Amino acid sequence: SNERDLFSLIDYFPNDTYVVSLRAPIKLFNDSYAWYDIYVEGNNKFYDHEAAAHVRDKLYQFIDDLSKNQNINAENITLIGFSQGAILSHAISFSYPEKIKNIMALSGVVDEKIMKKTSLIPKTNIYISHGTNDNLIDYETSKKSLNFYKGNDIDFKFESFEQGHGMNQQNLESMMRWLKEKI
């Protein structure tokens, strides 16, 4: 995916929403980018957790700088992440719980290995969706990763949709209804 994908959704956001969409630094192919490298050996996929944690911190610093230097309500920041962006959104909200109000994590997983250890439990509103036919990030793996939130008594909304590694109209409408209730 790339940074332009979010702008195709702009009409669904409330008029006073300040939208920032970032391009990940690693070019994969055509118009697709990644935040960190993914390695595949047989049926196993893995990535460098240290590199992902470094990206997490850089993204947080960008968010912090942006909220200080622009006319943005620093207490009403929502992260929307797809795939790696979803993984990073989970990590940012738990690593910096005082900064993020909402996350919308689409087709990703919760990975504790890239979360900073903190004693604060985030008050972040969390929306998670995943396609039941996702062949890139397994649906069942995504559901199992939610045990992290359940184990820490953190409330979240999870929805599944009959789709692959993407977002369909039903998913879009549902997540935007959720967001409008939260902002």
PLM feature spans:
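Gly/Ala-rich beta-loop-alpha elbow adjacent to hydrolase catalytic centers
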Residues: 81-85, 89
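Short beta-strand immediately N-terminal to the catalytic nucleophile in serine-hydrolase-like folds
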Residues: 79-81, 106
